[in-house]
A protein has these predicted regions:
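N-terminal redox-cofactor-binding region of secreted/periplasmic oxidoreductases
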Residues: 1-281
Length: 281
């Protein structure tokens, strides 16, 4: 959504979304997350492979299938990646991706109701505010954690991320502020922006070493679009590597096993996934 916003300032952009429009009232209301996590309309509702350490149970893995992606169905918590992760990306050769270098873009994208500071910005499209839901048990949990040796942290997006404390959320007043709300809705009427909902990308079309277009399915029809400049894959941590594999980019052995011609061998595609666990107490 953010890329569609920025790129359509000067370019013609086709935005493909496999899901539908974000019109469900459950998306707008924060407590609607309970309904969305069990939805099969706005949620891909994946299951993991059986986990040996969990008695071979499969763990439900919600992913957004709607405009705004997972930002339209998540718990609204605003916590950035750890600074050391970005620094690791830079060390691997991704120049420009250290935390110091990406922090200005985080600040530019947000309107933090705490005000402007070294780690927060104001005036941006994504509204971030304090979580208004507070119960006595919340404070009891914080106090118990401090007694157990954890430090109190009033800002997980500040100088330190470790510790215990209240988190901020992506809301405007008492409504969700998703990526679609922040970056897409304000520019939806641009003539050079085409948003195709219910358009599931089947593959990127590759010519030599370059992606030259996409093939997607919409309303039962298979459609091929040719890109005049470039193709950007923004399908999330699960379906971005899946889309690369469907396009012939990945481990040759795996692609051969699922009858996909390998156009570019790259063993790391679909590997090294890390995700956070959520435990409701």
């Amino acid at each position: 959504m953010c890329l569609a916003n920025r790129l359509s300032e000067n370019n013609r952009v086709l935005l493909l979304e496999a899901g539908g429009a974000d019109t469900s009232p459950f998306i707008k209301m924060p407590t609607g997350v309970i309904r969305l996590l069990s939805s099969r309309t706005e949620n891909w509702a994946f299951d993991t492979a059986p986990e040996p350490a969990l008695n071979n149970r499969k763990i439900n893995w919600p992913r957004g299938k709607v405009l705004g992606g997972s930002s339209s169905i998540n718990g609204l918590v605003y916590v950035r990646g750890h600074a050391q992760d970005y620094e690791r990306w830079r060390q691997l050769g991704n120049e420009g991706w250290s935390y110091e270098e990406v922090l200005p873009y985080f600040k530019r994208s947000m309107n933090n109701e705490r005000g402007e500071g070294p780690f927060h910005g104001i005036g941006g499209p994504l509204n971030v505010k304090e979580c208004e839901s507070s119960l006595p048990t919340h404070q009891h949990f914080i106090e118990a954690s401090i007694e157990a040796g954890y430090s109190f942290n009033p800002d997980f997006n500040g100088a330190e991320q470790e510790g215990v404390g209240p988190f901020q959320v992506t809301q405007v007043a008492r409504k969700r502020c998703s990526a679609a709300d922040a970056f897409l809705t304000p520019i939806i009427d641009r003539d050079n922006l085409n948003v195709a909902i219910l358009g599931r990308t089947l593959r990127n079309d590759i010519d030599g070493k370059k992606a030259v277009g996409v093939t997607y399915k919409q309303d039962g029809n298979q459609i091929q679009e040719v890109a005049s400049k470039e193709v950007l894959v923004c399908a999330g941590k699960v379906q971005s590597p899946q889309l690369l594999q469907l396009s012939g980019i990945g481990n040759p052995v795996h692609l051969n096993n699922v009858d996909v011609e390998c156009l570019h061998p790259l063993d790391g595609v679909g590997q090294n996934l890390q995700d956070h666990l959520n435990i409701v107490v």
